[in-house]
From Swiss-Prot:
InterPro entries: HAD-like_sf, HAD-SF_hydro_IIIA, HAD_sf, His_synth_bifunc_HisB, HisB_N, Histidinol-phos, IGPD_sf, ImidazoleglycerolP_deHydtase. The gene is hisB. Pfam families: IGPD, PNK3P. The keyword Ribonucleoprotein does not apply. Keywords: Amino-acid biosynthesis, Cytoplasm, Histidine biosynthesis, Hydrolase, Lyase, Magnesium, Metal-binding, Multifunctional enzyme, Zinc. GO terms for cellular component: cytoplasm. Its main location: cytoplasm. It catalyses: D-erythro-1-(imidazol-4-yl)glycerol 3-phosphate = 3-(imidazol-4-yl)-2-oxopropyl phosphate + H2O; L-histidinol phosphate + H2O = L-histidinol + phosphate. Pathway: Amino-acid biosynthesis; L-histidine biosynthesis; L-histidine from 5-phospho-alpha-D-ribose 1-diphosphate: step 6/9; Amino-acid biosynthesis; L-histidine biosynthesis; L-histidine from 5-phospho-alpha-D-ribose 1-diphosphate: step 8/9. This is Histidine biosynthesis bifunctional protein HisB.
Length: 357
């Protein structure tokens, strides 16, 4: 299993950065940022590992002798250690900007072993820092950056944000006279899908959503298939849509939009906006009434029901010759679009309104 890593800047993020010379070169300059210790303790408890990544201009030269750096730095480490907080690595670039080294943030030389070994849990790892270079560093790694600010996005807010994000999980149960549906969704995990609706082709289609959205789904539906497949498909869609909407929470940081065009001789188009407003448009024709034991007219009803509970705008269109390919391409393209839309890119609400409802 890959590691959930927080790559944390030191000066200005873990500890206060003095404005006189931007160096913590004596004990009297050492001051922890507010709430950093309780936040790191809480994040350690949900299996995050911590790595300090810091630029220290001219460290080891007359500009910044190591003797002045080491004493406050080691005291800082001892404070964290006394509270049960361990840093797995402390990575320091001692160079000046003009040295053009490959280890100074936002370059990624200091963490090259992590990138080479592919041991990062990319969706669940973050860079936390107070400078734009930290956010660029995150972008260069391919993970999310969180810009620390003592007022606007402090350690208390980072705690709340990462606790919400680390879960992004939902569990919905829907029991009616016609069906019993149990849906669990993990947006930050993939593989190990368990899907059983009693309709084999439908199971296959739902798995395509999970695979291409890179999420984990457990869906168990028991329905009145002795009558037909309508209630089973409809109630699964309603439950899945509600679970996806619940797992997204306040949608802070998500891409919000997604679109894609895949498969074989079929061309499927999916345009998705997790806007909080429901709108659905569907354009598809099939020559067969059924694919296996799955009614083709229920594809439209599935996505209409799903979008109503997701509170999203969804446009779907497909053309092609093979009904199996057309159906599969729609489910795959929706999964791809969903992957784009739910991917966390920053820590802001993706709307000028400041809310997505």
């Amino acid at each position: 299993m890959n590691d959930k890593i927080l790559f944390i800047d030191r000066d200005g993020t873990l500890i206060h950065e003095p404005k006189d010379n931007f160096q913590i070169d004596s004990l009297d300059k050492l001051l922890l940022e507010p709430y950093v210790i309780p936040t790191l303790i809480a994040l350690k408890n949900i299996k995050f590992k911590f790595i300090i990544v810091t630029n220290q201009n001219g460290l080891g030269t007359d500009l910044f002798p190591k003797t002045k750096f080491n004493k406050p730095h080691q005291f800082m480490i001892q404070i964290f250690k006394s509270q049960g907080i361990k840093f797995d690595q402390i990575l320091i670039c001692p160079h000046l900007p003009e040295d053009q080294c490959n280890c100074r943030k936002p370059k990624t030389g200091l963490i090259s072993c992590w990138l080479k070994n592919k041991s990062l849990d990319m969706p669940n790892s973050y860079v936390i820092g107070d400078r734009d270079t930290d956010i660029q560093f995150a972008h260069n790694i391919g993970i999310q950056g969180i810009k620390y600010h003592q007022i606007h996005f402090n350690w208390k807010k980072i705690h709340k944000y990462l606790m919400q994000n680390s879960h992004r999980v939902a569990h919905i149960q829907r029991i009616t006279n016609e069906t019993n549906v149990d849906v669990k969704i993990w947006l930050n995990q993939c593989d190990q899908n368990k899907i059983n609706t009693g309709i084999h082709f439908f199971d296959h289609m739902l798995e395509q959503i999970a695979i291409h959205a890179k999420i984990r789904m457990h869906i168990i539906t028991k329905g009145d298939l002795h009558i037909d497949d309508h209630h089973t498909i409809e109630d699964t869609a309603l439950s899945l849509g509600e679970a996806l909407n619940q797992a997204l929470g306040d949608k802070r940081g998500i891409g919000r939009f997604g679109f894609t065009l895949p498969m074989d001789e079929s061309i499927a188009q999916c345009i998705l906006d997790l806007s909080g407003r429901t709108y659905f448009d569907y354009q598809a024709e099939y020559s067969l009434q059924k694919i296996g034991n799955f009614s083709t007219h229920m594809i439209e009803h599935f996505f209409r029901s799903l979008s109503s509970k997701m509170h999203c705008t969804l446009h779907l269109k497909v053309i092609g010759n093979n009904d199996h390919h057309k159906a599969e391409s729609l489910f795959k393209s929706f999964g791809k679009s969903l992957n784009q839309a739910i991917y966390i890119q920053h820590n802001q609400i993706p709307s000028s309104k400041g809310i997505l409802l």
